[in-house]
Design a protein with these regions (language model features):
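Intrinsically disordered, low-complexity regions
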Residues: 20-21, 30, 39-40, 49, ...
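Broad hydrophobic/π-residue packing in well-ordered secondary structure
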Residues: 21, 25, 30, 51-56, ...
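Mixed-charge, Lys/Arg-enriched low-complexity segments
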Residues: 1-3, 57-93
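Negatively charged, low-complexity tracts enriched in Asp/Glu with abundant Ser/Thr
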Residues: 1-36
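Short, intrinsically disordered, mixed-charge
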Residues: 16, 46-49, 81-88
Length: 93
């Protein structure tokens, strides 16, 4: 598993087509906020396997799975590309 500081650095360094993100470490994960609006974009929670993270999105008033099929877990780079590309993450941002 990548260290917390390494994960933070990789998130910040990612190319975000809708503007940058501010990354806040909290509650066993990383919350991504839009630097343009301050809105919540996504939450990435490391699961302890290699560099895999669970991807969550802000839904109504809580973090939830971004689909109808349960938790979405993927390697960090794939998760960053997923969040950057999918417009529903940016609805509140």
């Amino acid at each position: 598993m990548a260290s917390g500081d390494a994960i933070h650095a990789r998130i910040v360094a990612h190319l975000w087509p809708r503007g940058g993100v501010e990354v806040v470490r909290a509650n066993k994960g990383y919350t991504l906020y839009s630097t343009r609006t301050g809105g919540q974009v996504a939450r990435l929670r490391p699961i302890g396997e290699e560099d895999k993270v669970q991807v969550l999105w802000w839904r109504r008033s809580a973090w939830g799975d971004p689909g109808d099929f349960g938790p979405v877990v993927m390697p960090l780079d794939q998760a960053l590309n997923f969040v950057a590309a999918e417009s529903f993450f940016w609805i509140s941002a």
